[in-house]
Amino acid sequence: MGATATDIEKVPSAGTPDEPKAGETNVYVDTEAEKSFVRKVDFFVLPMLCLMYFFDCMDRSNLANAKTDGLEEDINLKGNEYSLLILLFYIPFGLFDLPWNLLIKRYSARIMLSLRRYAVTVVWGICALCQCAANNFGGLLAIRIILGVFEAGFFAGSTFYFTLFYTRNEMGFRLAVLQSFAVLASAFSGLISFGLFQINHSAVKGWQWLFIVEGAMTLIIGVIGFWWLPDTAQSAWFLTQRERDAASARLLRDTSAEIETKLELKAAFQTWSDWKFPIWAVITFSYPVAYATAMNFFPIIVARLGYSVVKTNLWTVAPNLVGAVVLLVVAKSSDIFRERSLHIIFSLTVSLVGMLILASIDVSHNKGVSYFACFLLASGAYIPTCLVHAWHNNNNTNENSRAANTGFFVGLGNIAGVLSAATFRTEYAPKYVPTLVATCACNGVCILATAFMGTWMRLENRRKDKEQGARIVAGQVETRMLADGEKSPEWRYFL
């Protein structure tokens, strides 16, 4: 049994307090301690997770940079073997998200995220060295599959971990900050690649140095993370007791019906039979295709402009940096207005326009327009990753259910990377028009599904307002009062 509202100090009042009305609060939250708590979590927890995710993404996406330095020729890749290296990585990368997240709920994020990060560091370091000796498709494929197992679960686990500290209107921006480090990893991977590819060594190629150096850079951060991250706010070494009390109260006000609950599988899978679950599945499967296209194939797309290996890697930096800034701005707007669906649709539309331009013009004669389209793709492709998962978590007050749903939906999105990799076939080079068309189709499906879900939620909120004769929005009713979830009379969807 987790902590509930009865465990939290109530506001003093004369007589027996009535049940709180919409917009009122019975849970006392020390505002000064709350502000101090948020500042400390932003300072101690968020940066550590961002650094861990940065190196996580560096390891995952450097294959595209290595390709520009002659990886295919050096290990004799033939036909679609490069696409297979990416495609087969995404299978374990998607399948292991749910198990990792349930383990995080059972044993805490501090243990699972850090040990997983440390394990992948050791495994990747060993594999990087073995890769230098193997120099063949089979060896590299084995490395990618092992990497996929250990890389899985970090974003899903971090998303669930954030719900143990942040309220619903704080989630979007914090996830965007985390996601921006993935974008920065993609950008800096190009800069690091530029430097390492200049190393002239007869025995070790530039792309091999890339794997070795980026793998080694993750070791220290993985070890520190294990000792640095707290299990929950209640066990955080950097908080005072007053701040811990404020942390519990604020989560019961605007995140969870109960906190610090034990893992219960029945509760974890309780929403999987709901009719909306398949709609969420469509959304979380379709939006990541554009993200995977941008992350894994950006250097290849930019290479269509006809520049050298060095310039190709450098020219991927600017679109990613702009994409990171746009990501933070849109996510902050989403938190301020407590609105997700329209912001998601906006971002999907921006990346859709970019891909349509890339698919429809002759790149060799329209380099400026093509490069501008890369900026549009980067500006829109990264945003749904944080807002979609903030959205479905915002509409779920059960910790167990959030852990399972987030693991499944993030894993489903990771498997969607298979679609992106499968469509980047050598026979489609150099324009990759079928690839871009398929990605556009996925964006279109996601726009429709998101619009449907957002519209239905708005209509349902209005129906309840009409029945109860009062306009209530998500946030006015404390989540501690919503133990029955969507069946609670005062439930309102976070739009």
Swiss-Prot record:
Residue segments, region Disordered: 1-24
Keywords of the record: Cell membrane, Glycoprotein, Membrane, Transmembrane, Transmembrane helix, Transport
Residues the record marks as carrying a glycan: N200, N395
Full protein name: Major facilitator-type transporter hxnP
Membrane topology annotation: Multi-pass membrane protein
Single GO cellular component term: plasma membrane
Entry's transmembrane regions: 36-55, 84-104, 123-143, 145-165, 177-197, 209-229, 282-302, 314-334, 341-361, 368-388, 404-424, 436-456
Function statement: Major facilitator-type transporter, part of the hnx cluster involved in the purine degradation. The nicotinate hydroxylase hnxS accepts nicotinate as a substrate and catalyzes the first step of nicotinate catabolism. The major facilitator-type transporters hxnP and hxnZ are probably involved in the uptake of nicotinate-derived metabolites, and the oxidoreductases hxnT and hxnY in the further metabolism of 6-OH nicotinic acid.
GO MF annotations in UniProt: transmembrane transporter activity
Induction: Expression is induced by nicotinate and 6-OH nicotinate, subject to nitrogen metabolite repression mediated by the GATA factor areA, and strictly regulated by the cluster-specific transcription regulator hnxR.
InterPro entries xrefs: MFS (IPR011701), MFS_dom (IPR020846), MFS_trans_sf (IPR036259)
Domain of life, source organism: Eukaryota
PANTHER family cross-referenced by the UniProt entry: MAJOR FACILITATOR-TYPE TRANSPORTER HXNP, PERMEASE-RELATED
Chief localisation class: membrane
Keyword Cell division: no
Entry similarity comment: Belongs to the major facilitator superfamily.
PROSITE patterns: MFS
Compartment(s) of residence: Cell membrane
Biological source species: Emericella nidulans (strain FGSC A4 / ATCC 38163 / CBS 112.46 / NRRL 194 / M139)
